[in-house]
Amino acid sequence: MNKWLNTLSKTFTFRLLNCHYRRSLPLCQNFSLKKSLTHNQVRFFKMSDLDNLPPVDPKTGEVIINPLKEDGSPKTPKEIEKEKKKAEKLLKFAAKQAKKNAAATTGASQKKPKKKKEVEPIPEFIDKTVPGEKKILVSLDDPALKAYNPANVESSWYDWWIKTGVFEPEFTADGKVKPEGVFCIPAPPPNVTGALHIGHALTIAIQDSLIRYNRMKGKTVLFLPGFDHAGIATQSVVEKQIWAKDRKTRHDYGREAFVGKVWEWKEEYHSRIKNQIQKLGASYDWSREAFTLSPELTKSVEEAFVRLHDEGVIYRASRLVNWSVKLNTAISNLEVENKDVKSRTLLSVPGYDEKVEFGVLTSFAYPVIGSDEKLIIATTRPETIFGDTAVAVHPDDDRYKHLHGKFIQHPFLPRKIPIITDKEAVDMEFGTGAVKITPAHDQNDYNTGKRHNLEFINILTDDGLLNEECGPEWQGMKRFDARKKVIEQLKEKNLYVGQEDNEMTIPTCSRSGDIIEPLLKPQWWVSQSEMAKDAIKVVRDGQITITPKSSEAEYFHWLGNIQDWCISRQLWWGHRCPVYFINIEGEEHDRIDGDYWVAGRSMEEAEKKAAAKYPNSKFTLEQDEDVLDTWFSSGLWPFSTLGWPEKTKDMETFYPFSMLETGWDILFFWVTRMILLGLKLTGSVPFKEVFCHSLVRDAQGRKMSKSLGNVIDPLDVITGIKLDDLHAKLLQGNLDPREVEKAKIGQKESYPNGIPQCGTDAMRFALCAYTTGGRDINLDILRVEGYRKFCNKIYQATKFALMRLGDDYQPPATEGLSGNESLVEKWILHKLTETSKIVNEALDKRDFLTSTSSIYEFWYLICDVYIENSKYLIQEGSAIEKKSAKDTLYILLDNALKLIHPFMPFISEEMWQRLPKRSTEKAASIVKASYPVYVSEYDDVKSANAYDLVLNITKEARSLLSEYNILKNGKVFVESNHEEYFKTAEDQKDSIVSLIKAIDEVTVVRDASEIPEGCVLQSVNPEVNVHLLVKGHVDIDAEIAKVQKKLEKAKKSKNGIEQTINSKDYETKANTQAKEANKSKLDNTVAEIEGLEATIENLKRLKL
């Protein structure tokens, strides 16, 4: 199946006929035949054939089979497979037939190829607008504006929006929230570590669509921006940079000078990222921009720490932490990436020239003191032998009962190691049933050491070297070099037993790729178990809703198993812990002991607390060198940005926030911590709703990675970029030279022609259209490019409509019906109010797929139906008809641009500003215009149904014209003895003609006897038939055979439906909807059979 689909050229895309109207489908729904057919051969693929073709998945090329039968019951796998094979044959046959027909007819034209039409180059658009001023709108007749160019359309508007303050919250005259309510979102602060990626663009697209929508609904709206200092991430990037540039470490600079270097980095990349955000159209209130290391937010961080420390929630303890040797700091569990290996595997480790072996279980023997026995144990980390302080066996294991209480001899150190019994630490059935215990380097062993009061011996320095505890022969050796040497010496001592493959999980640092070492370190911890209970309760009680439900379930699971949080980091960039060690004169005290630490918002406060604690002692204070985990300051974001701990107006107005929108991957890093700290420090939830969006992957479903070369810079999608330039960007990052070549190959596979210019509006719309509530988004750049073409549709339609309205057109002061509307106007206004209702409801439910597809569909109704149909009204109608058609056209453009504004802010502003304005319009920008809502007077179902009949007649007439290859001067007859249908068709003859290019007139009759001989028939419904005069156009025998085939197919379909209806238990098991659908289908099929039989008789008479 894929073979012939994948060999296709992209020379054309069919426009399919919908059941109601002709339209272009979104790129994701296009059925593209890409076989080696020329553009001239397209017409030989008949529309009737297309109607019968099965749908195909545009990405995989696989046929899509409906898994349900007509009565709603599921098909069996065998039935599905049979139907699939049949569909594939049909597709192959259709493609062959189209090519065959084309080859037979276009031979002559191929001998005389037409000259290619020379396309005049479009001159470059030069925007002369002064930054911050309202954009100078050049006439659309200007050659530079002939075609849609996103760069032209999107220029100047953002600076004007900022200058005019349209993004700032709007209050009533007395400074209160507007009656419509408040809507506010705290934007997740991006790290100041380089550049935004497409995931940031998705976040902004979703958030800003909701912000703009609610602003247009009249609410007091705040979209609060800011940036995160990103401690580990930023420091590690700057360290890499200064090493690559100057061959210096941070220690060469010293703390103060190095932090100065990081601030320089921050200033440069902060402005770069801010520019990217503005290019994305985010309607942030920049007057409230926040930064986690600003003096204001630092005050909030210090306040939070001191309060929690004084309450005992923050405490000092020496525990195992995840130590990154490369970064020389502890990292949280959430910053650890686990790599699973099945067996012996070689991995690259920072600081080692050769790869290191993992996935191996090494067995060796400990000599039992006082006997010739040896106790065999197994380990994946032989180098930790120097930290062993016990060997544990199960108390019920008969093999070792005689060894209870005895000792073994360490092979490299003069250390006697006790043999202990422990039910929790030992599984008798696993391995030898004897386990080495290394309390200072393994979490399970740590717990065992606590139970048995064992010695905790740390064998590693912060740099991952063996320390003095290992003896002079080993001290200073790298940990993984020591692993090899330990095995060698065990062999020399005849204590080595063997190795075997071992499936295992290896913890790595997500920032550096280093192998994590569990190290015993004194750190600051947050006790979370009690806070977690409150966080669970507010979600269960509905004070916070989490969408989707899968994320809510993960939230409960994580909080139900929460551990205390290590918040100190051995870094220089960040908030220095506001806690001080009390050095009492003449005394020595352990820094692990929390009794000798005081927290203070200032040194003066700390001195007062220390003096109160030790009133009769002389002391000095020394502030902790460590900084706080970045997620601690980020956890305060919803209230620190509003001025907490001060009782500001912003805190009173906007806290708690309406919602928090972010990726589900940082639900635990960030979202839960904001809830925990918000409840603890403010007594309130920080937001009322959490919406977790999907993660963006590439078109093949792979995670985006610099090394794969599939990371997408949103600016490259907006402006376009060549493949060579994509390659060049790889050299600007911190990728290893070996990774660069791999990434280049990945880029060539993903973007062989580079990335086309799509513009911000198309990218935003595509990202929102992708948001379906799933876990992942497989982003295809071609789909984004498809929405650029949609932008062109909007641009050209508005341009054409403005020409139709004329320069002197002035819309009525208020919107509404005049009473002079034609049927097509009533129909399109019904569609407008219907779409407005659907979109409002969808956005309120965060249903972005429904909202974007409904708006997309509505624009195509305007372009392909109303504008086409209104041409004759505006050109040839009476003065009243012309005025009504123009007023309706204005209503459509005004509302359609407003509907799409939250998703496409730039093109909607550009084209809306070109529309004439009602005298009552108060908004200077579409940003502040009112969002379209349901209007009951437009909800004319009867008129809508009547015009749907017109469109169905049009569809069937087009189908016949295409099938019989009649390209002009076609003669169409509509037959109906149903009074209402007859009147509709008669009244709308001009509409039908305007929608069908190949005919000059339509005749409407009441009886089939009025149809001339030589016509073929297509049934619209049981009461309406469309006839096309084919006499003189076709081979009669061939057409009789063709109609006979259709008749046989229709009869077969009728039999199938009747079998379903007459089947056992149908009346009791089939639902009402299925029964109604089957009855309607049967009625239509019967009418089709009668019409086809009449057509055959008619064609036979032509032969006489």
Swiss-Prot record:
Phosphothreonine (modified residue): where?
A: T1003
Query: Which Pfam family name is an example for this entry?
Result: tRNA-synt_1
Motif 'KMSKS' region, per the record, lies over 703-707
Note the HAMAP family from the entry: Val_tRNA_synth_type1 (MF_02004)
**What InterPro entries is this protein classified in?**
aa-tRNA-synth_I_CS, aa-tRNA-synth_Ia, Anticodon_Ia_Val, M/V/L/I-tRNA-synth_anticd-bd, Rossmann-like_a/b/a_fold, tRNA-bd_arm, tRNAsynth_Ia_anticodon-bd, Val-tRNA_synth_C_sf
Mind telling me where the transit peptide is?
1-47
The record's section on Gene3D superfamilies has: HUPs, Isoleucyl-tRNA Synthetase, Domain 1, Valyl-tRNA synthetase, C-terminal domain, Valyl/Leucyl/Isoleucyl-tRNA synthetase, editing domain
A GO BP entry is: valyl-tRNA aminoacylation
Which stretch carries the motif 'HIGH' region? 190-200
Q: Member of which family? A: Belongs to the class-I aminoacyl-tRNA synthetase family.
TM region positions:
none
Q: What is this protein called?
A: Valine--tRNA ligase, mitochondrial
Q: Which residues carry this modification: Phosphoserine?
A: S73, S294, S332, S707
Report which reactions are catalysed by this protein.
Answer: tRNA(Val) + L-valine + ATP = L-valyl-tRNA(Val) + AMP + diphosphate
Q: What else is known?
A: Present with 358 molecules/cell in log phase SD medium.
Q: Which UniProt keywords apply?
A: Aminoacyl-tRNA synthetase, ATP-binding, Cytoplasm, Ligase, Mitochondrion, Nucleotide-binding, Phosphoprotein, Protein biosynthesis, Transit peptide
Q: Which GO terms describe its molecular function?
A: aminoacyl-tRNA deacylase activity; ATP binding; sequence-specific mRNA binding; valine-tRNA ligase activity
Chain positions recorded as ATP binding sites: K706
GO CC annotations on file: cytoplasm; cytosol; mitochondrion
- The segment annotated Disordered runs over 99-119
So what EC number does this one have? 6.1.1.9
